[in-house]
């Protein structure tokens, strides 16, 4: 039933008038789909589809509450992750090609590949931290406008996972964040809470 609703949103819905129900269903199902990348053959496709659904849900939420910065922060986070991945592979490949092209050293080992690997991991790690910071900002604001405080926890777990990804345990935190993300979306009420009060001016 939920999947049928998702298809009806994507095909028949008036995109100029998104609702919180759209955000709830698209975001929740999208987050769950992102978790099943391990399924043979089609898992990665389902995961990408889920990622796109979450993006659509957050764009809808930004539009509903007139909070474009939420979606902007998310896009910055995604861009940081992509840049980190690209830098990682470019530095690794460049180091290996340099090692292959350089003449052998008889008296001292060539440490260029090792240094390249270290730099690649550090660049990837830095990009992940930047991405985690912006995701945390986006989900923190989502918690404020929707009244679902679990979004704030989701953003924090994403940030922790991004920081710890360099030692692999961060991947577990990212999986937990995805689960919390799904629960957060499904916890959205169709009636929006009153907007948070602006900070006092002294």
Stretches found by the model and what they are:
Residues 112-128, 166:
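Hydrophobic alpha-helical transmembrane segments
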């Amino acid at each position: 039933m939920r999947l049928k609703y998702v298809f009806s949103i994507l095909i028949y819905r008036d995109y100029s008038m998104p609702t919180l129900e759209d955000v709830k269903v698209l975001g929740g199902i999208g987050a769950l789909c992102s978790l099943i990348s391990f399924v043979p053959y089609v898992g990665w496709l389902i995961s990408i589809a889920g990622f796109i659904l979450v993006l659509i849900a957050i764009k809808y939420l930004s539009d509903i509450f007139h909070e474009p910065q939420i979606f902007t922060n998310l896009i910055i986070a995604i861009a940081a992750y992509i840049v980190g991945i690209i830098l990682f592979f470019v530095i690794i490949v460049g180091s290996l090609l340099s090692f292959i092209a350089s003449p052998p050293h008889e008296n001292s080992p060539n440490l260029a590949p090792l240094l390249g690997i270290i730099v690649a991991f550090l660049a990837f790690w830095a990009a992940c931290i930047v991405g985690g910071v912006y995701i945390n900002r986006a989900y923190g604001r989502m918690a404020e406008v929707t009244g679902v405080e679990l979004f704030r926890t989701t953003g924090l777990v994403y940030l922790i996972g991004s920081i710890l990804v360099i030692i692999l345990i961060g991947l577990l935190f990212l999986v937990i964040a995805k689960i919390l993300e799904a629960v957060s979306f499904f916890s959205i009420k169709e009636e929006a809470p009153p907007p948070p009060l602006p900070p006092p001016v002294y």
